[in-house]
Amino acid sequence: MNLHEYQAKQLFAQYGLPTPEGYACSTPCQAEEAASKIGSGPWVVKCQVHAGGRGKAGGVKCVESKEAIHAFAEQWLGKRLVTYQTDAHGQPVRQILVEGATEIARELYLGAVIDRSSRRVVFMASTEGGVEIEQVAQKTPHLIHRVALDPLTGPQPYQGRELAFKLGLSGKQAQQFGQIFLGLATLFLQCDLTMAEINPLVITPQGDLLCLDGKLDVDSNALFRQPTLLEMEDPAQNDAREAHAAQWELNYVALEGNIGCMVNGAGLAMGTMDIVKLHGGAPANFLDVGGGATKERVTEAFKIILSDEHVRAVLVNIFGGIVRCDLIADGIIGAVAEVGVHVPVVVRLEGNNAELGTRILADSGLNIIAATSLTDAARQVVSAVEGK
């Protein structure tokens, strides 16, 4: 679950990280009042959406007057912001963040992720703040410095000092960086985060460190023990189809192709998308119905896939390990009949009762094409899309 910038900064403040004074506002009048609380300008106004690239899209602006703040709020509140990280429809802007402008002498980067190869929380720091860390990793990887947290001892002060010295900090700045490191590490662990990022972490002309922007991702599997964070969720930022899928415990990710994919198992789903692409097709989605696929879940999966107007065919790839393929076949037939599927449906069944399931599909009289293998399924669904 993603958090907005203003929510991340609220948590930063709770854990002792220095942030600019700012207020999240949902009306132009509130935005003007926030500017008055902060004091004299200039101010920075930022659209609050779950996407990067806001500045280049016009969603971040430095303004000199309250009239300009009012105009910015009127321009964006209730609208959708399109950035390079969103789809063509963009993300809805329900709030803007008003902050006092900060003078910047230097920009740094500090972030943390879960490194699955080492099974540790790994902190990364760089002198190249203010740009995407992926660009730094690609072009100048030697400028990224790392430390891993031991799960038994947790973050240690010496690790913060080590990163600070590698960034060229000393004295008061090294001490401040160490405190920010410990605070962010504690926040990461206590709030069950999967990613935390301060970019940029700036040094002001007075020599103080300030968290100018923040991004936090919470582990969705841990939300049952994070009720306060769960209340921060903004459902409006989620894709409607992905939200519908989550209600049925389906893992769905929208893509840009025209072949809908329904598979049980994440690895098989990724392999299915790969082989569709290999044979010239373009997957419209990733959809994992899980090991306990039922008629109801298959029906909802069809509804979600077909809600994408670009879908011109559907590929169902089921491996019957936990589930019986004949029951899945009955579920597919019932779902196709209930939903009213008007595009070709190619089904490949393998495993427990696969032959019986294939016969059931063949005898259904519906527009369902039974495939003999995964390769055959990919070829057939691509041919169906091409009208062959």
From Swiss-Prot:
Q: Which residues bind Mg(2+)?
A: N199, D213
GO terms under cellular component: cytosol; succinate-CoA ligase complex
State the InterPro entries in the record.
ATP-grasp, ATP-grasp_succ-CoA_synth-type, ATP_grasp_subdomain_1, Succ-CoA_synthase_bsu_CS, SUCC_ACL_C, Succ_CoA_ligase-like_bsu, Succinyl-CoA_synth-like
Catalysed transformations (reactions): succinate + ATP + CoA = succinyl-CoA + ADP + phosphate; GTP + succinate + CoA = succinyl-CoA + GDP + phosphate
Q: Where does substrate bind?
A: N264, G321, I322, V323
- Give the protein's cofactors: Mg(2+)
Record Pfam families: ATP-grasp_2 (PF08442), Ligase_CoA (PF00549)
**Which pathway is this protein assigned to?**
Carbohydrate metabolism; tricarboxylic acid cycle; succinate from succinyl-CoA (ligase route): step 1/1
Annotated ATP binding sites: K46, G53, R54, G55, E99, T102, E107
- Return one Gene Ontology term, BP aspect: tricarboxylic acid cycle
EC nos: 6.2.1.5
Q: Which family does it belong to?
A: Belongs to the succinate/malate CoA ligase beta subunit family.
Relate the protein's function as given in its record: Succinyl-CoA synthetase functions in the citric acid cycle (TCA), coupling the hydrolysis of succinyl-CoA to the synthesis of either ATP or GTP and thus represents the only step of substrate-level phosphorylation in the TCA. The beta subunit provides nucleotide specificity of the enzyme and binds the substrate succinate, while the binding sites for coenzyme A and phosphate are found in the alpha subunit.
Subunit details: Heterotetramer of two alpha and two beta subunits.
Protein name per its UniProtKB record: Succinate--CoA ligase [ADP-forming] subunit beta
Question: What is the originating organism of this protein?
Answer: Edwardsiella ictaluri (strain 93-146)
The lineage is: Bacteria, Pseudomonadati, Pseudomonadota, Gammaproteobacteria, Enterobacterales
Q: Give me the gene this protein comes from.
A: sucC
